[in-house]
């Protein structure tokens, strides 16, 4: 009983000290007191490597908004998703786990530094990311991108922290960060970036937001709002940001009583990688060319598929032309509409993320 009371008093005493320090830091502009508080390293266990790492849920106690975004992202489900489980024959292929449940991407950075290879780390020979064998359900978790080999959490900002913290703004704002796992897409990016478009992966897939890094008490009182990024990692945010990233256009339409023929022109206008992109998994983009009657019913249709494996993807700045011919039936005198739809799909056609759509009214 005495031991329990002593522990309670210690916790209360530390909490009281922190409250006083927080108030003083706020009043003084957070200068000296911020440095003092950070140097105290109150929770070093948060930055433990290996099985001792407490898990992303622990990070979510303070980084509430970021954790919620990550929890709803595909990164958090990179190991537990049915697609990954089936594709790896129930996790038989360990090579894939290195990126779907990494210890930390800095194992690759460490290897690159030791070998003194002066190239982007994603191209460093014999470098690799180490796979976790613990807490696999978290997939690409917080430590995967933020925990260094020196047991420090790194990121683009500095500030008050109860755990070791290292600022690395340049790396966290570069596509090289994402390229440690998304190797093939990053190589495409290196090939095409600079041709009038210098946007990084983060610019499109991590929407900008101004907020405090943490929302929990009392730490949030020591933080000011900063420009940051949402941790959603979504293709939908990229589409929302660049609504005309790919353009569809009907050209050379030949319209008569017997048939309608023409072309659909596709241009990858604003993306620094191919559409689709990536080496692993089922990645398909579908083009549907539909002929509709005056009631909106599809009476004729043609489908074109684009795969990286077949080298039919649309590269940055590339224009592809797909021809179509629709023979007309006895309703050819009715008003019809041509429609072209471009969307991402998966193997069982449950994913139909719309990329672009164009319509052309026809008078017969």
Please report, for each region that a protein language model flagged, where it lies by residue.
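Bacterial N-terminal signal peptides
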Residues: 17-26
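Beta-rich carbohydrate-recognition modules and glycan-binding surfaces
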Residues: 1, 16-17
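Short, conserved sequence motifs used for protein processing/export or organelle targeting and
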Residues: 195-198, 203, 207-364
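Sequence context of c-type cytochrome heme-c attachment sites
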Residues: 30-194
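A broad structural signal for short, well-ordered beta-strand segments within beta-sheet-rich domains
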Residues: 2, 140, 333-337
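A short, structural micro-pattern
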Residues: 3-4, 136-139, 198, 283
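Short Gly/Ser/Thr- and charged-rich N-terminal loops/segments
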Residues: 13
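N-terminal secretory signal peptides that target proteins for export/translocation
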Residues: 1-10
